[in-house]
């Protein structure tokens, strides 16, 4: 079995299809085209637990009022069925052909356990939060911010002892001091909307990756300097952030990015969506993310003659997903 159509790779579209058995790219195929083929997307930052809050979201709340430590979001989380909310978010993830989700999980070990028996054919990386006396429930740490979390250094140390990842929000609503972040040296930082050029230079020198969430940022009137990050050669990923603000659909995200960041090439946007945080993942040479043939594929309907324009055209739909081996 195979899909016939142009296949997106790091160097552009190539080949004439993919094998659905081995996931390998096929150079020559007979027959009519099935569509345009791209690797599974990577959603590098989500909060799926508040997905169902989208229907109840109050208007005109500030960033702090909505997602701060005492904000509306946390009151909603305490009063609602989070498992149903996560399932709703995962349906959006699956429908858009997303093979990797990196979810910041509130609620300590109990929050992580909400994922334990859920059916998702892709890979979930859960980044836990402190709860009670337990600083780090499992191996990965998702720190809200250095300002909000007093024990961030100890949390990061525990994560590294367990070979886990450390992620943290920074400079989302205003510029924050970069020095404590560099001292913490997380694997990746989320947002950086108000970071200075010097901040980005220090991030690059420290080998820290960056995840950008353009739709979520735009909700609060923020805009990450994505063009600057790309020009510096930073390791970048895209995320959809809070489910209460935006769908967890990566196709929606990249089509928004195209409109908001019109100077970026479609190849660059699609590359980040499909191969985001590659440098971070490939620090571990055993990572399957370094092997394109193990990444899985999405078949999109052909909406335009140009392959890139077709992917970004709202009329193009997901026809099928070949999940990772």
Predicted regions, residues:
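C-terminal cap of metal-dependent C-N hydrolases
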Residues: 288-325
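Short, well-structured alpha-helical segments that form the helix of a local strand-helix-strand
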Residues: 84-86, 266-277, 289-293
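N-terminal metal-binding scaffold of metallo-dependent hydrolase/deaminase domains
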Residues: 1-31, 283
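Histidine-centered catalytic micro-motifs
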Residues: 39-51, 165-172
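Divalent metal-coordination and catalytic microenvironments
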Residues: 6, 19, 23, 34, ...
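Active-site loop-helix segments enriched in His/Asp/Glu that coordinate
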Residues: 74-140, 144-157
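Active-site core of metal-dependent hydrolases
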Residues: 130-244, 262-263
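Active-site gating loops and adjacent loop-to-helix segments of metal-dependent hydrolytic enzymes
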Residues: 50-84, 174-185, 209, 257-264
